Amino acid sequence: MSFGFEDQNRDINAAIVRAFKADKLLFAAASNNGGNKPRSRPARSDKVICIHACDGKGNKGGMSPSPEENSLNFTTLGVAVKSRWKKKTVYKSGTSFATPVAAATAASVLEFANFKCNLSEEDRANLYKREGLLKVFQAMSTKRDGYDYVNPGHMWDGKSDEDVIRSIQDILDDI
């Protein structure tokens, strides 16, 4: 969800609750107000995965709200994202650009697991739940500037498929 509000929205909240109960993974943009305001809604919800923005090296983007203590503060590429607008190449920044990057990263992990891992039904179900994917993102993250920089390279770079399969299985064994 590449949007956010300061106030509650009953319809959006109801949709999030329904999706969460159906074990759908939900990602929400943190906010672009920097340290001036907290996370927006729905990113404040404990039923979504809140996403902050960073540059391609994991450096904070300046637009994300301050990281919350004792909370996961995932950040993905959301600064100077190459885009097309009115037939021209432009570079856009914001947590609303970081959020689909996080969703795509999650989709890549899930597809890899579906095709390469010999998962039990229980493990597959756990991987597709918020808590399971949070564990995967934590395994792919490093602390940087108070944020949890999600870098798929931490899981894949220089590793064989067997190594990645083992990493995913180890994560699932801890759930």
Stretches found by the model and what they are:
Residues K24, P38-N114:
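Extracellular S/T/G-rich loop segment that most often corresponds to the catalytic His/Ser-adjacent loop
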Residues F5-Q8, S31-G35, D55-K57:
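Short beta->alpha connector loops
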Residues F5-E6, R18-K21, E111, V136:
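Low-complexity, intrinsically disordered flanking regions
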Residues D145-I175:
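C-terminal domain-closing interface element
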